[in-house]
C-alpha cells in the first residue's frame, strides 16, 4: 500500500492536458453538483475518520496493545522524546491539519464555497482513503514501534516540527486572505440589500487577485505553504518514512498542474498585465 499509493499521481496526470476541473473557481453548472461545503467536508473527513479507526484498531490486531493518548497529540513530543514520540508528532499533526481542513474550514470559516462535481468528489474521496490506509497502517504498527528505531534521527524531529508548524500557519494565513475576499463581498452585498430593504437570498461570488503575504509573488501561495507543511512532516518521520514521502509527492503532482491551470484562469479573467509577474506557485520560478 505504501508504494502503490503513488499511483494516484498517475491518475492526476490528466490535469496537465485538460483544463476541465469542476470545482472551486472553475466549477461548472451541473444537475449532479454537490454543495461545496458538504462535499468538501465529507470527502476530506472520510480519510480522517479512517485514519482514526486504524489507529484505534490495528495495534490490538498486531498485539501491540493500546497506543497511549500522547500518540494522538502533538503535545506528546514535548513531554517525552522516547518511544512513540515520533508517532505522537505525526499523528498529532495529521489530526490538527484535518480538523482544520475537513471540519473548521468548510463548515465554519468559509463564507461560501462553489459546488463540487461528483467526479471530483469521488477522486478526492479515493485519494483520502488511500492516504489514510497508508499512513494509518504505518503509524499504528507497520512502521517503527520502539524508541531504538527512532533514536538515530531524533535530532531532526524538532526541525521538522518547526517547518511543519510554519507551513501550517502560513497555509492558514493565505487561506484566510482568500476568505476575506469573500467576506468583503458578503458585507458589501448585505449592506446594499439593507439599504434597499431587500432580502439577501444568496451572496454572489466575487473573484479578485489576492495581494497579501506570498500572494504578492504567487497566485497559489497556499499550495506552496501546504507543500512546506508536509515536507516538515516527512522530516519528522524520517527520510525513509515511505507514506510521508509518497503523500508529499502525490500532493505536488496533483496541485502543481492545478496551480498552472489556475494561473491560466487568472490570465483569462484579469489579463496578464494585472498579474504583475506573479508566478503560479513558486515565487520567481514557476
Where do the PLM segments sit?
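N-terminal signal-anchor/initial transmembrane insertion module
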Residues: 1-69
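Juxtamembrane membrane-interface segments at transmembrane-helix boundaries in membrane proteins
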Residues: 20-39, 67-85, 147-157, 205-212, ...
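Intramembrane catalytic core of multi-pass membrane enzymes that act on lipidic substrates
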Residues: 32, 56-141
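Residue-level micro-sites within transmembrane alpha helices that shape
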Residues: 43, 100, 225-228
Amino acid at each position: 500500500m505504501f508504494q502503490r499509493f503513488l499511483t494516484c499521481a498517475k491518475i492526476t496526470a490528466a490535469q496537465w492536458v485538460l483544463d476541465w476541473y469542476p470545482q472551486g473557481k472553475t466549477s461548472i453548472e451541473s444537475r449532479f453538483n454537490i454543495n461545496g461545503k458538504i462535499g468538501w467536508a465529507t470527502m476530506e473527513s472520510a480519510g480522517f475518520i479512517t485514519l482514526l479507526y486504524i489507529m484505534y484498531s490495528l495495534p490490538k490486531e498486531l498485539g501491540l496493545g493500546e497506543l497511549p493518548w500522547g500518540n494522538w497529540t502533538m503535545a506528546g513530543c514535548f513531554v517525552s522524546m522516547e518511544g512513540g514520540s515520533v508517532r505522537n508528532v505525526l499523528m498529532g499533526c495529521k489530526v490538527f491539519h484535518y480538523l482544520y481542513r475537513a471540519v473548521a474550514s468548510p463548515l465554519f470559516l468559509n463564507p461560501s464555497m462553489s459546488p463540487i462535481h461528483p467526479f471530483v468528489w469521488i477522486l478526492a474521496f479515493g485519494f483520502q482513503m488511500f492516504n489514510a490506509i497508508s499512513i494509518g497502517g504505518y503509524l499504528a504498527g507497520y512502521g517503527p514501534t520502539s524508541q531504538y528505531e527512532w533514536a538515530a534521527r531524533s535530532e531532526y524531529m524538532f526541525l521538522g516540527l518547526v517547518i511543519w508548524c510554519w507551513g501550517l500557519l502560513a497555509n492558514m494565513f493565505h487561506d484566510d486572505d482568500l476568505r476575506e475576499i469573500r467576506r468583503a463581498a458578503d458585507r458589501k452585498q448585505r449592506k446594499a440589500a439593507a439599504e434597499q430593504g431587500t432580502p439577501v437570498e444568496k451572496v454572489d461570488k466575487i473573484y479578485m487577485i489576492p495581494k497579501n503575504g506570498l500572494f504578492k509573488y504567487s497566485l497559489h501561495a497556499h499550495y506552496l505553504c501546504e507543500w512546506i507543511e508536509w515536507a516538515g512532516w516527512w522530516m519528522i518521520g524520517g527520510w525513509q518514512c515511505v507514506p510521508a514521502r509518497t503523500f508529499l509527492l502525490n500532493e505536488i503532482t496533483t496541485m502543481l498542474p492545478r496551480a498552472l491551470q489556475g494561473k491560466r484562469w487568472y490570465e483569462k479573467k484579469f489579463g496578464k498585465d494585472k498579474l504583475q509577474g506573479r508566478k503560479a506557485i513558486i515565487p520567481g520560478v514557476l
